[in-house]
Amino acid sequence: MSAVRPLLLLLLPLCPGPGPGHGSEAKVVRSCAETRQVLGARGYSLNLIPPSLISGEHLQICPQEYTCCSSETEQKLIRDAEVTFRGLVEDSGSFLIHTLAARHRKFNEFFREMLSISQHSLAQLFSHSYGRLYSQHAVIFNSLFSGLRDYYEKSGEGLDDTLADFWAQLLERAFPLLHPQYSFPPDFLLCLTRLTSTADGSLQPFGDSPRRLRLQITRALVAARALVQGLETGRNVVSEALKVPMLEGCRQALMRLIGCPLCRGVPSLMPCRGFCLNVAHGCLSSRGLEPEWGGYLDGLLLLAEKLQGPFSFELAAESIGVKISEGLMHLQENSVKVSAKVFQECGTPHPVQSRNRRAPAPREETSRSWRSSAEEERPTTAAGTNLHRLVWELRERLSRVRGFWAGLPVTVCGDSRMAADLSQEAAPCWTGVGRGRYMSPVVVGSLNEQLHNPELDTSSPDVPTRRRRLHLRAATARMKAAALGQDLDMHDADEDASGSGGGQQYADDWKAGAAPVVPPARPPRPPRPPRRDGLGVRGGSGSARYNQGRSRNLGSSVGLHAPRVFILLPSALTLLGLR
Protein backbone atom coordinates (compact mmCIF):
# COMPACT_ATOMS: atom_id res chain seq x y z
CA MET A 1 0.00 0.00 0.00
CA SER A 2 2.87 2.30 0.75
CA ALA A 3 4.20 1.68 -2.76
CA VAL A 4 0.86 2.61 -4.38
CA ARG A 5 0.47 5.95 -2.51
CA PRO A 6 3.23 7.79 -4.41
CA LEU A 7 1.70 6.60 -7.68
CA LEU A 8 -1.75 7.97 -6.69
CA LEU A 9 -0.24 11.33 -5.78
CA LEU A 10 1.31 11.55 -9.23
CA LEU A 11 -1.98 10.70 -11.02
CA LEU A 12 -4.23 13.01 -8.92
CA PRO A 13 -3.50 16.27 -10.82
CA LEU A 14 -4.58 14.58 -14.06
CA CYS A 15 -8.09 13.77 -12.75
CA PRO A 16 -10.88 16.25 -13.84
CA GLY A 17 -12.33 18.37 -11.03
CA PRO A 18 -15.70 20.17 -10.69
CA GLY A 19 -16.42 22.91 -13.28
CA PRO A 20 -16.75 26.59 -12.47
CA GLY A 21 -19.94 27.78 -10.83
CA HIS A 22 -22.54 30.07 -12.39
CA GLY A 23 -20.87 33.16 -11.00
CA SER A 24 -17.30 32.26 -11.90
CA GLU A 25 -15.05 33.29 -14.75
CA ALA A 26 -15.63 31.88 -18.20
CA LYS A 27 -14.75 28.26 -18.77
CA VAL A 28 -11.40 27.65 -20.31
CA VAL A 29 -11.93 27.34 -24.08
CA ARG A 30 -8.88 26.28 -25.98
CA SER A 31 -10.45 26.13 -29.46
CA CYS A 32 -11.42 29.05 -31.74
CA ALA A 33 -13.50 26.85 -34.02
CA GLU A 34 -16.81 28.51 -33.09
CA THR A 35 -15.37 32.00 -33.54
CA ARG A 36 -13.85 31.05 -36.91
CA GLN A 37 -17.22 29.72 -38.05
CA VAL A 38 -19.11 32.89 -37.06
CA LEU A 39 -16.58 35.36 -38.42
CA GLY A 40 -16.04 33.32 -41.57
CA ALA A 41 -19.77 33.62 -42.30
CA ARG A 42 -19.39 37.40 -41.97
CA GLY A 43 -16.67 37.46 -44.59
CA TYR A 44 -13.62 37.61 -42.33
CA SER A 45 -10.42 36.05 -43.63
CA LEU A 46 -9.73 32.87 -41.68
CA ASN A 47 -6.02 33.58 -42.02
CA LEU A 48 -6.50 36.32 -39.41
CA ILE A 49 -8.18 33.97 -36.92
CA PRO A 50 -6.00 31.38 -35.18
CA PRO A 51 -7.39 27.85 -34.74
CA SER A 52 -6.76 28.02 -30.99
CA LEU A 53 -6.37 30.67 -28.33
CA ILE A 54 -3.30 32.85 -28.37
CA SER A 55 -1.91 35.37 -25.92
CA GLY A 56 -4.04 38.54 -25.74
CA GLU A 57 -1.42 41.06 -24.67
CA HIS A 58 -1.94 42.98 -27.93
CA LEU A 59 -5.66 43.63 -27.31
CA GLN A 60 -6.70 47.24 -26.62
CA ILE A 61 -10.33 46.85 -25.48
CA CYS A 62 -11.07 43.20 -24.69
CA PRO A 63 -9.50 41.52 -21.63
CA GLN A 64 -5.82 40.82 -22.32
CA GLU A 65 -6.18 37.10 -21.74
CA TYR A 66 -6.14 34.18 -24.16
CA THR A 67 -7.96 35.27 -27.30
CA CYS A 68 -9.01 34.34 -30.82
CA CYS A 69 -8.51 37.89 -32.15
CA SER A 70 -5.51 39.55 -33.68
CA SER A 71 -5.18 43.33 -33.51
CA GLU A 72 -6.67 43.64 -36.99
CA THR A 73 -9.62 41.41 -36.08
CA GLU A 74 -10.30 43.47 -32.96
CA GLN A 75 -10.41 46.71 -34.98
CA LYS A 76 -12.80 45.18 -37.50
CA LEU A 77 -15.05 43.95 -34.71
CA ILE A 78 -15.12 47.47 -33.24
CA ARG A 79 -16.41 48.81 -36.55
CA ASP A 80 -18.91 45.96 -36.88
CA ALA A 81 -20.29 46.58 -33.38
CA GLU A 82 -20.80 50.26 -34.20
CA VAL A 83 -22.55 49.44 -37.48
CA THR A 84 -24.84 46.94 -35.75
CA PHE A 85 -25.81 49.38 -33.02
CA ARG A 86 -26.29 52.27 -35.43
CA GLY A 87 -28.49 50.13 -37.67
CA LEU A 88 -30.71 49.13 -34.76
CA VAL A 89 -31.09 52.74 -33.64
CA GLU A 90 -31.91 54.02 -37.13
CA ASP A 91 -34.35 51.20 -37.79
CA SER A 92 -36.10 51.91 -34.51
CA GLY A 93 -36.35 55.62 -35.37
CA SER A 94 -37.44 55.20 -38.98
CA PHE A 95 -41.10 55.13 -37.96
CA LEU A 96 -40.66 58.37 -36.01
CA ILE A 97 -38.99 60.15 -38.92
CA HIS A 98 -41.60 58.86 -41.34
CA THR A 99 -44.42 59.97 -39.03
CA LEU A 100 -43.15 63.55 -38.74
CA ALA A 101 -42.32 63.78 -42.45
CA ALA A 102 -45.71 62.44 -43.52
CA ARG A 103 -47.61 64.76 -41.14
CA HIS A 104 -45.57 67.72 -42.39
CA ARG A 105 -46.34 66.90 -46.00
CA LYS A 106 -50.06 66.37 -45.41
CA PHE A 107 -50.59 69.54 -43.36
CA ASN A 108 -48.53 71.62 -45.76
CA GLU A 109 -50.44 70.34 -48.78
CA PHE A 110 -53.74 70.94 -47.01
CA PHE A 111 -52.98 74.55 -46.05
CA ARG A 112 -51.68 75.42 -49.49
CA GLU A 113 -54.64 73.82 -51.20
CA MET A 114 -57.09 75.60 -48.90
CA LEU A 115 -55.61 78.94 -49.97
CA SER A 116 -55.99 77.94 -53.61
CA ILE A 117 -59.58 76.82 -53.01
CA SER A 118 -60.33 80.11 -51.27
CA GLN A 119 -58.91 82.09 -54.18
CA HIS A 120 -60.83 80.03 -56.72
CA SER A 121 -64.06 80.31 -54.71
CA LEU A 122 -63.69 84.08 -54.44
CA ALA A 123 -63.08 84.37 -58.17
CA GLN A 124 -66.19 82.31 -58.94
CA LEU A 125 -68.38 84.30 -56.54
CA PHE A 126 -67.24 87.70 -57.71
CA SER A 127 -67.26 86.74 -61.38
CA HIS A 128 -70.86 85.61 -61.01
CA SER A 129 -71.83 88.77 -59.13
CA TYR A 130 -69.85 91.40 -61.03
CA GLY A 131 -68.92 89.81 -64.33
CA ARG A 132 -66.50 91.85 -66.43
CA LEU A 133 -65.94 94.37 -63.66
CA TYR A 134 -64.21 91.67 -61.63
CA SER A 135 -62.40 89.93 -64.47
CA GLN A 136 -60.83 93.21 -65.59
CA HIS A 137 -59.41 93.93 -62.16
CA ALA A 138 -58.87 90.51 -60.58
CA VAL A 139 -55.17 91.27 -60.24
CA ILE A 140 -55.69 93.03 -56.90
CA PHE A 141 -57.17 89.87 -55.40
CA ASN A 142 -54.49 87.70 -56.95
CA SER A 143 -51.93 90.01 -55.36
CA LEU A 144 -53.62 89.56 -51.99
CA PHE A 145 -53.41 85.77 -52.19
CA SER A 146 -49.83 85.99 -53.44
CA GLY A 147 -48.95 87.95 -50.33
CA LEU A 148 -50.68 85.40 -48.10
CA ARG A 149 -48.78 82.56 -49.77
CA ASP A 150 -45.50 84.41 -49.47
CA TYR A 151 -46.03 84.82 -45.75
CA TYR A 152 -46.93 81.16 -45.25
CA GLU A 153 -44.34 79.61 -47.55
CA LYS A 154 -41.39 81.99 -47.55
CA SER A 155 -40.91 85.10 -45.51
CA GLY A 156 -43.03 84.90 -42.38
CA GLU A 157 -43.15 88.70 -42.49
CA GLY A 158 -45.28 91.42 -44.00
CA LEU A 159 -48.68 89.87 -43.37
CA ASP A 160 -50.08 93.05 -41.81
CA ASP A 161 -48.73 95.11 -44.68
CA THR A 162 -50.23 92.78 -47.27
CA LEU A 163 -53.71 93.07 -45.80
CA ALA A 164 -53.49 96.81 -45.13
CA ASP A 165 -52.23 97.49 -48.66
CA PHE A 166 -55.09 95.49 -50.12
CA TRP A 167 -57.71 97.60 -48.34
CA ALA A 168 -55.83 100.78 -49.24
CA GLN A 169 -55.82 99.82 -52.92
CA LEU A 170 -59.51 99.06 -52.72
CA LEU A 171 -60.29 102.40 -51.09
CA GLU A 172 -58.27 104.45 -53.56
CA ARG A 173 -60.31 102.94 -56.38
CA ALA A 174 -63.64 102.91 -54.54
CA PHE A 175 -63.92 106.51 -53.47
CA PRO A 176 -63.44 108.07 -56.94
CA LEU A 177 -65.94 105.62 -58.42
CA LEU A 178 -68.51 106.65 -55.84
CA HIS A 179 -68.14 110.23 -57.12
CA PRO A 180 -67.59 110.06 -60.89
CA GLN A 181 -68.54 113.73 -61.21
CA TYR A 182 -65.31 114.81 -59.46
CA SER A 183 -61.64 114.79 -60.35
CA PHE A 184 -59.35 113.44 -57.60
CA PRO A 185 -55.72 114.54 -57.80
CA PRO A 186 -52.95 112.57 -56.05
CA ASP A 187 -52.84 114.98 -53.11
CA PHE A 188 -56.50 114.37 -52.39
CA LEU A 189 -56.06 110.58 -52.40
CA LEU A 190 -53.02 110.98 -50.17
CA CYS A 191 -55.20 112.89 -47.70
CA LEU A 192 -57.83 110.16 -47.98
CA THR A 193 -55.30 107.48 -47.12
CA ARG A 194 -54.01 109.54 -44.20
CA LEU A 195 -57.51 109.80 -42.76
CA THR A 196 -57.96 106.03 -42.76
CA SER A 197 -54.63 105.62 -40.93
CA THR A 198 -55.39 107.84 -37.96
CA ALA A 199 -55.11 106.33 -34.51
CA ASP A 200 -58.64 107.26 -33.47
CA GLY A 201 -60.13 105.27 -36.35
CA SER A 202 -62.72 107.97 -36.97
CA LEU A 203 -62.93 107.11 -40.67
CA GLN A 204 -63.61 103.42 -41.25
CA PRO A 205 -64.80 103.24 -44.85
CA PHE A 206 -65.06 99.44 -44.79
CA GLY A 207 -66.40 99.22 -41.27
CA ASP A 208 -65.06 96.44 -39.09
CA SER A 209 -64.35 94.07 -41.98
CA PRO A 210 -60.61 94.83 -42.28
CA ARG A 211 -60.03 94.19 -38.59
CA ARG A 212 -62.04 90.98 -38.49
CA LEU A 213 -60.44 89.63 -41.65
CA ARG A 214 -57.04 90.51 -40.31
CA LEU A 215 -57.69 88.69 -37.04
CA GLN A 216 -58.88 85.51 -38.70
CA ILE A 217 -56.23 85.41 -41.40
CA THR A 218 -53.37 86.37 -39.10
CA ARG A 219 -54.17 83.85 -36.40
CA ALA A 220 -54.86 81.03 -38.82
CA LEU A 221 -51.74 81.64 -40.94
CA VAL A 222 -49.49 82.13 -37.92
CA ALA A 223 -50.75 78.88 -36.39
CA ALA A 224 -50.54 76.95 -39.67
CA ARG A 225 -47.04 78.17 -40.38
CA ALA A 226 -45.83 77.39 -36.86
CA LEU A 227 -47.32 73.88 -37.01
CA VAL A 228 -45.73 73.02 -40.35
CA GLN A 229 -42.40 74.49 -39.27
CA GLY A 230 -42.61 72.57 -36.01
CA LEU A 231 -43.14 69.27 -37.81
CA GLU A 232 -40.26 70.01 -40.15
CA THR A 233 -37.95 70.96 -37.29
CA GLY A 234 -38.84 67.80 -35.39
CA ARG A 235 -38.17 65.63 -38.42
CA ASN A 236 -34.78 67.25 -39.03
CA VAL A 237 -33.73 67.11 -35.38
CA VAL A 238 -34.70 63.45 -35.00
CA SER A 239 -33.00 62.48 -38.26
CA GLU A 240 -29.82 64.23 -37.18
CA ALA A 241 -29.92 62.76 -33.68
CA LEU A 242 -30.17 59.21 -35.01
CA LYS A 243 -27.19 59.60 -37.35
CA VAL A 244 -24.58 61.44 -35.29
CA PRO A 245 -21.12 59.82 -35.01
CA MET A 246 -20.53 57.77 -31.88
CA LEU A 247 -18.14 58.86 -29.19
CA GLU A 248 -15.05 56.78 -28.56
CA GLY A 249 -16.30 55.65 -25.16
CA CYS A 250 -19.47 54.30 -26.74
CA ARG A 251 -17.51 52.44 -29.44
CA GLN A 252 -15.36 50.75 -26.83
CA ALA A 253 -18.36 49.80 -24.69
CA LEU A 254 -20.12 48.27 -27.69
CA MET A 255 -17.01 46.26 -28.49
CA ARG A 256 -16.91 44.89 -24.94
CA LEU A 257 -20.62 44.10 -25.23
CA ILE A 258 -20.89 42.16 -28.49
CA GLY A 259 -17.35 41.91 -29.86
CA CYS A 260 -15.30 40.56 -27.00
CA PRO A 261 -17.28 37.28 -26.68
CA LEU A 262 -16.01 36.42 -30.16
CA CYS A 263 -12.45 37.19 -29.19
CA ARG A 264 -12.86 35.12 -26.06
CA GLY A 265 -13.99 32.16 -28.15
CA VAL A 266 -17.57 32.06 -26.80
CA PRO A 267 -19.73 33.75 -29.49
CA SER A 268 -22.79 31.80 -28.35
CA LEU A 269 -22.59 33.35 -24.86
CA MET A 270 -25.06 36.26 -25.03
CA PRO A 271 -24.33 39.55 -23.23
CA CYS A 272 -26.17 40.14 -19.96
CA ARG A 273 -29.27 42.29 -20.36
CA GLY A 274 -28.25 44.73 -17.63
CA PHE A 275 -24.86 45.11 -19.29
CA CYS A 276 -26.56 45.94 -22.61
CA LEU A 277 -28.96 48.43 -21.03
CA ASN A 278 -26.15 50.35 -19.36
CA VAL A 279 -24.21 50.52 -22.62
CA ALA A 280 -27.29 51.54 -24.60
CA HIS A 281 -28.34 54.19 -22.06
CA GLY A 282 -24.84 55.61 -22.02
CA CYS A 283 -24.48 55.69 -25.80
CA LEU A 284 -27.96 57.11 -26.39
CA SER A 285 -27.89 59.68 -23.61
CA SER A 286 -26.03 62.05 -25.94
CA ARG A 287 -28.64 61.52 -28.65
CA GLY A 288 -31.87 61.58 -26.68
CA LEU A 289 -34.08 64.65 -26.68
CA GLU A 290 -35.71 64.33 -23.28
CA PRO A 291 -37.21 66.27 -21.59
CA GLU A 292 -37.73 68.62 -24.54
CA TRP A 293 -39.39 65.84 -26.52
CA GLY A 294 -42.53 65.69 -24.37
CA GLY A 295 -43.01 69.45 -24.47
CA TYR A 296 -42.53 69.44 -28.22
CA LEU A 297 -45.28 66.87 -28.74
CA ASP A 298 -47.60 68.81 -26.42
CA GLY A 299 -46.98 71.95 -28.48
CA LEU A 300 -47.86 70.15 -31.71
CA LEU A 301 -51.11 68.80 -30.32
CA LEU A 302 -52.11 72.10 -28.71
CA LEU A 303 -51.60 74.03 -31.93
CA ALA A 304 -53.35 71.41 -34.04
CA GLU A 305 -56.40 71.61 -31.77
CA LYS A 306 -56.47 75.40 -32.11
CA LEU A 307 -56.32 75.11 -35.91
CA GLN A 308 -59.52 73.10 -36.02
CA GLY A 309 -61.13 75.19 -33.28
CA PRO A 310 -60.78 78.89 -32.47
CA PHE A 311 -58.05 79.47 -35.08
CA SER A 312 -59.82 77.48 -37.78
CA PHE A 313 -57.82 77.66 -40.98
CA GLU A 314 -60.77 76.45 -43.04
CA LEU A 315 -63.05 79.16 -41.67
CA ALA A 316 -60.42 81.85 -42.15
CA ALA A 317 -59.81 80.84 -45.77
CA GLU A 318 -63.53 80.73 -46.52
CA SER A 319 -64.14 84.14 -44.92
CA ILE A 320 -61.84 86.15 -47.18
CA GLY A 321 -64.41 86.76 -49.90
CA VAL A 322 -67.19 87.31 -47.37
CA LYS A 323 -65.26 89.91 -45.38
CA ILE A 324 -64.27 91.79 -48.55
CA SER A 325 -67.85 91.87 -49.76
CA GLU A 326 -69.09 93.02 -46.37
CA GLY A 327 -66.55 95.84 -46.44
CA LEU A 328 -67.72 96.98 -49.86
CA MET A 329 -71.33 96.91 -48.72
CA HIS A 330 -70.46 99.02 -45.68
CA LEU A 331 -68.75 101.58 -47.91
CA GLN A 332 -71.79 101.75 -50.17
CA GLU A 333 -74.29 102.04 -47.33
CA ASN A 334 -72.28 104.75 -45.55
CA SER A 335 -70.98 106.58 -48.60
CA VAL A 336 -72.72 109.85 -47.68
CA LYS A 337 -71.26 109.93 -44.17
CA VAL A 338 -67.79 108.87 -45.34
CA SER A 339 -67.78 111.36 -48.21
CA ALA A 340 -68.85 114.23 -45.99
CA LYS A 341 -65.99 113.64 -43.56
CA VAL A 342 -63.48 113.22 -46.37
CA PHE A 343 -64.57 116.42 -48.11
CA GLN A 344 -64.45 118.24 -44.79
CA GLU A 345 -60.86 117.19 -44.11
CA CYS A 346 -59.43 117.08 -47.63
CA GLY A 347 -61.51 119.71 -49.40
CA THR A 348 -63.92 119.46 -52.30
CA PRO A 349 -62.36 118.22 -55.55
CA HIS A 350 -62.91 119.89 -58.88
CA PRO A 351 -65.86 118.71 -60.97
CA VAL A 352 -65.22 116.77 -64.16
CA GLN A 353 -66.60 117.95 -67.45
CA SER A 354 -69.55 115.86 -68.52
CA ARG A 355 -67.87 114.58 -71.67
CA ASN A 356 -65.01 113.15 -69.58
CA ARG A 357 -67.17 111.17 -67.17
CA ARG A 358 -66.83 107.42 -67.08
CA ALA A 359 -69.34 105.38 -69.04
CA PRO A 360 -71.75 103.31 -66.97
CA ALA A 361 -71.22 99.61 -66.68
CA PRO A 362 -73.34 97.35 -68.88
CA ARG A 363 -76.80 96.75 -67.51
CA GLU A 364 -76.46 93.01 -67.41
CA GLU A 365 -73.41 93.32 -65.15
CA THR A 366 -75.12 95.61 -62.67
CA SER A 367 -78.30 93.63 -62.29
CA ARG A 368 -76.73 90.53 -60.74
CA SER A 369 -77.50 90.05 -57.10
CA TRP A 370 -75.04 89.19 -54.33
CA ARG A 371 -75.20 85.65 -53.10
CA SER A 372 -74.18 84.92 -49.53
CA SER A 373 -71.33 82.53 -48.88
CA ALA A 374 -73.72 80.33 -46.92
CA GLU A 375 -75.11 79.19 -50.26
CA GLU A 376 -71.72 77.95 -51.38
CA GLU A 377 -70.59 74.38 -50.81
CA ARG A 378 -68.00 73.85 -48.14
CA PRO A 379 -64.64 73.50 -49.93
CA THR A 380 -62.64 70.33 -49.57
CA THR A 381 -59.23 69.36 -50.87
CA ALA A 382 -58.78 67.26 -53.97
CA ALA A 383 -58.02 64.22 -51.82
CA GLY A 384 -61.14 64.77 -49.72
CA THR A 385 -59.02 65.60 -46.68
CA ASN A 386 -60.29 67.84 -43.93
CA LEU A 387 -58.56 69.36 -40.96
CA HIS A 388 -60.46 67.26 -38.41
CA ARG A 389 -59.14 64.05 -39.92
CA LEU A 390 -55.58 65.40 -40.14
CA VAL A 391 -55.62 66.38 -36.47
CA TRP A 392 -57.04 62.99 -35.45
CA GLU A 393 -54.29 61.21 -37.39
CA LEU A 394 -51.63 63.45 -35.86
CA ARG A 395 -52.87 62.74 -32.34
CA GLU A 396 -52.96 59.00 -33.00
CA ARG A 397 -49.44 58.91 -34.51
CA LEU A 398 -47.86 61.05 -31.80
CA SER A 399 -49.31 58.87 -29.06
CA ARG A 400 -47.12 56.04 -30.38
CA VAL A 401 -43.86 57.98 -30.25
CA ARG A 402 -44.22 59.90 -26.98
CA GLY A 403 -41.94 57.53 -25.08
CA PHE A 404 -39.60 56.86 -27.99
CA TRP A 405 -36.37 58.23 -26.53
CA ALA A 406 -36.95 56.78 -23.07
CA GLY A 407 -37.70 53.35 -24.53
CA LEU A 408 -35.02 53.30 -27.22
CA PRO A 409 -32.38 51.48 -25.09
CA VAL A 410 -34.91 48.77 -24.24
CA THR A 411 -35.81 48.44 -27.92
CA VAL A 412 -32.16 48.10 -28.93
CA CYS A 413 -31.39 45.53 -26.25
CA GLY A 414 -34.43 43.54 -27.32
CA ASP A 415 -32.53 42.47 -30.43
CA SER A 416 -31.05 38.98 -30.22
CA ARG A 417 -27.62 40.25 -31.30
CA MET A 418 -27.35 42.66 -28.38
CA ALA A 419 -28.40 40.80 -25.23
CA ALA A 420 -29.81 37.61 -23.81
CA ASP A 421 -33.55 37.13 -23.95
CA LEU A 422 -35.63 37.95 -20.88
CA SER A 423 -36.50 34.26 -20.55
CA GLN A 424 -32.78 33.50 -20.06
CA GLU A 425 -32.16 36.22 -17.50
CA ALA A 426 -31.32 33.69 -14.78
CA ALA A 427 -28.77 31.88 -16.95
CA PRO A 428 -25.07 32.82 -17.04
CA CYS A 429 -24.27 35.51 -19.61
CA TRP A 430 -21.40 37.63 -20.86
CA THR A 431 -20.50 40.27 -18.26
CA GLY A 432 -17.81 42.06 -20.24
CA VAL A 433 -14.97 39.99 -18.79
CA GLY A 434 -16.35 36.47 -18.83
CA ARG A 435 -19.26 34.17 -18.02
CA GLY A 436 -21.33 35.05 -14.98
CA ARG A 437 -24.03 37.41 -13.77
CA TYR A 438 -24.03 41.17 -14.23
CA MET A 439 -24.08 42.74 -10.78
CA SER A 440 -23.84 46.47 -11.60
CA PRO A 441 -27.09 48.48 -11.31
CA VAL A 442 -28.76 49.68 -14.49
CA VAL A 443 -28.53 53.48 -14.75
CA VAL A 444 -31.44 55.13 -16.57
CA GLY A 445 -32.59 58.71 -16.86
CA SER A 446 -31.11 62.02 -17.95
CA LEU A 447 -27.63 62.90 -19.08
CA ASN A 448 -26.72 63.99 -15.55
CA GLU A 449 -27.75 60.60 -14.15
CA GLN A 450 -25.61 58.88 -16.78
CA LEU A 451 -22.55 60.30 -15.07
CA HIS A 452 -22.85 57.27 -12.76
CA ASN A 453 -22.99 54.76 -15.63
CA PRO A 454 -20.43 52.02 -14.88
CA GLU A 455 -19.79 51.14 -18.53
CA LEU A 456 -18.74 54.43 -20.13
CA ASP A 457 -17.86 58.00 -19.33
CA THR A 458 -20.54 60.53 -20.32
CA SER A 459 -19.03 63.57 -18.61
CA SER A 460 -17.64 65.21 -21.75
CA PRO A 461 -19.84 68.07 -23.09
CA ASP A 462 -21.93 67.27 -26.16
CA VAL A 463 -22.42 70.51 -28.08
CA PRO A 464 -24.40 68.99 -31.02
CA THR A 465 -26.94 67.45 -28.65
CA ARG A 466 -27.41 70.75 -26.84
CA ARG A 467 -27.88 72.49 -30.18
CA ARG A 468 -30.56 69.99 -31.25
CA ARG A 469 -32.39 70.42 -27.97
CA LEU A 470 -32.31 74.18 -28.39
CA HIS A 471 -33.82 73.83 -31.87
CA LEU A 472 -36.58 71.66 -30.46
CA ARG A 473 -37.16 74.07 -27.60
CA ALA A 474 -37.38 77.02 -30.00
CA ALA A 475 -39.92 75.21 -32.18
CA THR A 476 -41.98 74.41 -29.09
CA ALA A 477 -41.94 78.04 -27.96
CA ARG A 478 -43.01 79.18 -31.42
CA MET A 479 -45.93 76.74 -31.48
CA LYS A 480 -47.12 77.62 -27.98
CA ALA A 481 -46.95 81.32 -28.85
CA ALA A 482 -48.92 80.69 -32.04
CA ALA A 483 -51.55 78.89 -29.95
CA LEU A 484 -51.97 82.21 -28.12
CA GLY A 485 -52.21 84.14 -31.38
CA GLN A 486 -48.64 85.44 -31.23
CA ASP A 487 -46.04 85.30 -33.99
CA LEU A 488 -42.53 85.20 -32.54
CA ASP A 489 -41.04 85.71 -36.01
CA MET A 490 -42.60 89.15 -36.39
CA HIS A 491 -40.49 92.01 -35.09
CA ASP A 492 -43.46 94.36 -34.86
CA ALA A 493 -46.13 92.00 -33.47
CA ASP A 494 -49.53 93.61 -33.54
CA GLU A 495 -51.77 93.65 -30.48
CA ASP A 496 -54.83 92.78 -32.55
CA ALA A 497 -53.37 89.40 -33.45
CA SER A 498 -51.60 88.58 -30.21
CA GLY A 499 -54.36 88.00 -27.67
CA SER A 500 -53.85 86.68 -24.19
CA GLY A 501 -55.76 83.44 -24.41
CA GLY A 502 -56.83 80.73 -26.77
CA GLY A 503 -58.83 82.88 -29.14
CA GLN A 504 -61.96 83.35 -27.07
CA GLN A 505 -61.47 87.12 -27.12
CA TYR A 506 -62.76 87.31 -30.67
CA ALA A 507 -65.42 84.65 -30.51
CA ASP A 508 -67.59 86.61 -32.93
CA ASP A 509 -65.06 85.93 -35.63
CA TRP A 510 -65.32 82.20 -35.02
CA LYS A 511 -69.11 81.83 -34.93
CA ALA A 512 -69.02 81.09 -31.22
CA GLY A 513 -71.91 83.37 -30.40
CA ALA A 514 -70.08 85.60 -27.94
CA ALA A 515 -69.66 89.34 -28.09
CA PRO A 516 -66.36 90.62 -29.43
CA VAL A 517 -63.82 92.39 -27.31
CA VAL A 518 -62.42 95.32 -29.22
CA PRO A 519 -58.61 95.33 -29.09
CA PRO A 520 -56.55 98.46 -28.66
CA ALA A 521 -56.37 100.71 -31.68
CA ARG A 522 -53.50 100.16 -34.05
CA PRO A 523 -50.84 102.83 -34.32
CA PRO A 524 -51.33 105.06 -37.35
CA ARG A 525 -49.89 103.74 -40.58
CA PRO A 526 -47.81 106.11 -42.68
CA PRO A 527 -49.82 107.88 -45.40
CA ARG A 528 -49.71 106.49 -48.92
CA PRO A 529 -49.75 108.61 -52.04
CA PRO A 530 -52.04 107.31 -54.78
CA ARG A 531 -50.80 105.08 -57.58
CA ARG A 532 -50.77 106.28 -61.14
CA ASP A 533 -52.57 103.67 -63.19
CA GLY A 534 -55.21 105.76 -64.92
CA LEU A 535 -58.15 103.73 -63.61
CA GLY A 536 -60.95 105.99 -62.44
CA VAL A 537 -58.75 108.90 -61.25
CA ARG A 538 -59.03 112.27 -62.93
CA GLY A 539 -57.34 115.58 -62.73
CA GLY A 540 -53.80 114.67 -61.74
CA SER A 541 -50.71 113.04 -63.12
CA GLY A 542 -50.38 110.83 -60.04
CA SER A 543 -47.24 109.58 -58.37
CA ALA A 544 -45.63 106.26 -57.58
CA ARG A 545 -46.83 104.67 -54.40
CA TYR A 546 -44.31 104.36 -51.66
CA ASN A 547 -44.08 102.76 -48.25
CA GLN A 548 -42.73 105.31 -45.82
CA GLY A 549 -40.79 104.06 -42.82
CA ARG A 550 -41.47 100.39 -43.51
CA SER A 551 -39.13 97.54 -44.29
CA ARG A 552 -40.08 94.25 -45.83
CA ASN A 553 -38.38 91.50 -47.74
CA LEU A 554 -39.01 90.36 -51.26
CA GLY A 555 -41.38 87.58 -50.28
CA SER A 556 -43.78 89.89 -48.51
CA SER A 557 -43.90 92.50 -51.27
CA VAL A 558 -44.66 90.29 -54.24
CA GLY A 559 -48.28 91.26 -54.43
CA LEU A 560 -48.01 94.90 -53.40
CA HIS A 561 -47.25 96.58 -56.74
CA ALA A 562 -50.24 95.51 -58.77
CA PRO A 563 -52.55 98.20 -60.25
CA ARG A 564 -55.39 99.20 -57.99
CA VAL A 565 -58.84 98.08 -59.00
CA PHE A 566 -62.31 98.29 -57.55
CA ILE A 567 -65.32 96.01 -57.71
CA LEU A 568 -68.41 98.19 -57.76
CA LEU A 569 -71.50 96.70 -56.19
CA PRO A 570 -74.48 96.52 -58.56
CA SER A 571 -76.70 98.38 -56.13
CA ALA A 572 -74.08 101.11 -55.83
CA LEU A 573 -74.19 101.61 -59.59
CA THR A 574 -77.94 101.95 -59.37
CA LEU A 575 -77.71 104.54 -56.60
CA LEU A 576 -75.22 106.54 -58.62
CA GLY A 577 -77.62 106.72 -61.54
CA LEU A 578 -75.36 104.82 -63.91
CA ARG A 579 -78.03 102.44 -65.09
UniProtKB/Swiss-Prot annotation:
Residues 1-21 form the signal peptide. Glycans are attached at residues 55, 92, 155, 498, 500. The lineage of its organism: Eukaryota, Metazoa, Chordata, Craniata, Vertebrata. Nervous system. Keywords: Cell membrane, Glycoprotein, GPI-anchor, Heparan sulfate, Lipoprotein, Membrane, Proteoglycan, Secreted, Signal. One of its GO terms (cellular component) is side of membrane. InterPro entries: Glypican, Glypican_CS. A lipid is attached at residue 556 (GPI-anchor amidated serine). Residues 517-527 have a biased composition (Pro residues). It is found in: Cell membrane. This is Glypican-2. It comes from the Eukaryota. Interacts (via heparan sulfate) with PTN; this interaction promotes neurite outgrowth through binding of PTN with chondroitin sulfate of proteoglycans, thereby releasing PTPRS of chondroitin sulfate proteoglycans (CSPGs) and leading to binding with heparan sulfate of GPC2. Interacts (heparan sulfate chain) with MDK; this interaction is inhibited by heparin followed by chondroitin sulfate E; this interaction induces GPC2 clustering through heparan sulfate chain; this interaction induces neuronal cell adhesion and neurite outgrowth. It is a lipid-anchor; GPI-anchor. Residues 361-379 have a biased composition (Basic and acidic residues). Belongs to the glypican family. GO terms for biological process: cell migration; neuron differentiation; positive regulation of neuron projection development; regulation of protein localization to membrane; regulation of signal transduction; smoothened signaling pathway.
